[in-house]
Amino acid sequence: METQRASLSLGRCSLWLLLLGLALPSASAQVLSYREAVLRAVDQLNEQSSEPNIYRLLELDQPPQDDEDPDSPKRVSFRVKETVCPRTTQQPPEQCDFKENGLLKRCEGTVTLDQVRGNFDITCNNHQSIRITKQPWAPPQAARICRIIFLRVCR
């Protein structure tokens, strides 16, 4: 009789551990990674955009070293680039090629990592690319000054 109770108690304990083990992965699966949250924000940007083509994540700045609370807003900063895929496409942006000379946008704001109640507050601005033109060679400023002084002294 005593053995039967012990085995029944052990069975219940095992059942509780099994249920607890099954519940934990589903709770942690509710949290997005920093990158996943940004990709969701890019999807939302594409949904709200009136531009002909969709954008794809080009560059993601380092995640903040904040707390791990999925409900607290995390600062994000990233760049997106226009793709060749039209807005009407059913294809995920990651499968679209970047458009040659496509528009670049710099996006900043906050995201939450909670998968169910994820919030995005993102602002994107056109990102002007800086074109560096090669200037004709000229001697350093100090050399020009010395040359001017030398010419005036010699005349």
Swiss-Prot record:
Gene3D superfamilies: 3.10.450.10. The keyword Signal applies. Belongs to the cathelicidin family. One of its GO terms (molecular function) is lipopolysaccharide binding. The modification Pyrrolidone carboxylic acid is found at Q30. It holds the Pfam family Cathelicidins. Keywords: Antibiotic, Antimicrobial, Disulfide bond, Pyrrolidone carboxylic acid, Secreted, Signal. Residues 1-29 form the signal peptide. This is Cathelicidin-1. It is found in: Secreted. It comes from Ovis aries (Sheep). GO terms for cellular component: extracellular space. Potent microbicidal activity; active against S.aureus and E.coli. Disulfide bonds join C85-C96, C107-C124, C146-C154. GO terms for biological process: antimicrobial humoral immune response mediated by antimicrobial peptide; defense response to Gram-negative bacterium; defense response to Gram-positive bacterium; innate immune response. Residues 30-143 form a propeptide. The keyword Signal applies.
